[in-house]
C-alpha cells in the first residue's frame, strides 16, 4: 500500500516535470527551435490542424526556421497562421518553402519571457506540492484505518518529502537553464 502511494506520487510528479519541459520549450529564446511553433494551428482540410502535422519544420540556422508544407496549397494558410499567432514572427515564403526569421529579443522582452518562465516553473512546483499533499492524505487515511502504524506513516511521509524536494530541485534547475538561455545576449 505504501509503495503504491509512493509510486503513484513519483509518476504524477514526473508528469509535472514533463509538462514543465514542454511549457518551457515553447517560450522563445531568440534562437530558432521548432517547438516555438507548437501552438500554431493551420486551417486545413476542414479543421484547425497543428502546424507540425501539415508541414515539416526544421532549423535552417541559429535564427531561422524552415517550413515545407506537405501540401503546396497550404503554404499561404501556414504563412497567415504564423502571422496571426501571438508569437510576433514574420514569415516569408518562396514557393512551398517558408522561412521564419527569429527577431532578436530586446531586454524588455527577455525579462517578460523570464517572468513567464518563472510563472511556469512556479506552477510546476505547486503541482508537485499538490501531489505530495494527496500522498500524505492517503497515508493519514491508512493510519486512521489502522492499516499502517504511525511509525510507518512517518517514514513514508519522510520519503515522500525527499521525493518532493528532488522534483522541486529539478524544476529549479530547468528554470535556471531556461533563464540563462533567455538572458544570454
From Swiss-Prot:
InterPro entries cross-referenced by the UniProt entry: Ribosome_recyc_fac, Ribosome_recyc_fac_dom, RRF_sf
Task: Give the UniProt subcellular location, in the record's own words.
Answer: Cytoplasm
Pfam families on file: RRF
- Domain of life, per the record? Bacteria
What keywords would UniProt list here?
Cytoplasm, Protein biosynthesis
Q: Which CDD domains match?
A: RRF (cd00520)
Q: Which SUPFAM superfamilies match?
A: Ribosome recycling factor, RRF
Gene3D superfamilies reported in the protein's UniProt record? 3.30.1360.40, Ribosome-recycling factor
Gene Ontology CC, one term: cytosol
- GO BP term, pick one: cytoplasmic translational termination
Keyword Protein biosynthesis assigned: yes
Name the principal localization, coarsely classed: cytoplasm
The UniProt GO MF terms for this protein read:
ribosomal large subunit binding
Family listed: Belongs to the RRF family.
User: What is this protein's function per UniProt?
Assistant: Responsible for the release of ribosomes from messenger RNA at the termination of protein biosynthesis. May increase the efficiency of translation by recycling ribosomes from one round of translation to another.
Cite the NCBIfam families for this sequence. frr
Q: Which HAMAP family match?
A: RRF
Q: What is this protein called?
A: Ribosome-recycling factor
Source organism (scientific name): Pseudomonas entomophila (strain L48)
Source gene? frr
